[in-house]
Amino acid sequence: MPKGAAGAGPRRHIAAGLQVGSYVKVADNSGAKEAMIIGVIGYKGRLRRIPPAAVGDMVVVTVKKGTPEMRKQVVRAIVIRQRRPYRRPDGTWIAFEDNAVVIVSPDGTPKGSEIRGPVAREAAERWPKVANIASIII
């Protein structure tokens, strides 16, 4: 991946709080309200192991609730919040109230123009285009 590309930032170990089959809230104004994770981009695991996802990961989701144009679409998204607590390098623990994603294009450009609620710092550092439209970064 070229230097400075989307998602090229360092991937720190974060406790995975989501997996394939998890329902997540869509936190942008793309028209989707709720989605289900059906894949994790870049995960190469063992046979029959359910792929885990954490804050900052790009996932493949199917839209379950939203506008008629968005429903039943298979799109990519970035995890911006997770309920499962994870530890930061400075020793603090952080957990959010919900599991949320932002719908993006395959190169990491957000489909919406605003993000509702906070965005984890780990996701903002890894995906600069998501950080640009975030209102709060925690």
Curated annotation (Swiss-Prot):
The keyword RNA-binding applies. GO terms for biological process: translation. The keyword Oxidoreductase does not apply. Keywords: Ribonucleoprotein, Ribosomal protein, RNA-binding, rRNA-binding. GO terms for cellular component: cytosolic large ribosomal subunit. InterPro entries: Ribosomal_uL14 (IPR000218), Ribosomal_uL14_arc (IPR019971), Ribosomal_uL14_CS (IPR019972), Ribosomal_uL14_sf (IPR036853). GO terms for molecular function: large ribosomal subunit rRNA binding; structural constituent of ribosome. Part of the 50S ribosomal subunit. Forms a cluster with proteins L3 and L24e, part of which may contact the 16S rRNA in 2 intersubunit bridges. Belongs to the universal ribosomal protein uL14 family. Binds to 23S rRNA. Forms part of two intersubunit bridges in the 70S ribosome. This is Large ribosomal subunit protein uL14.
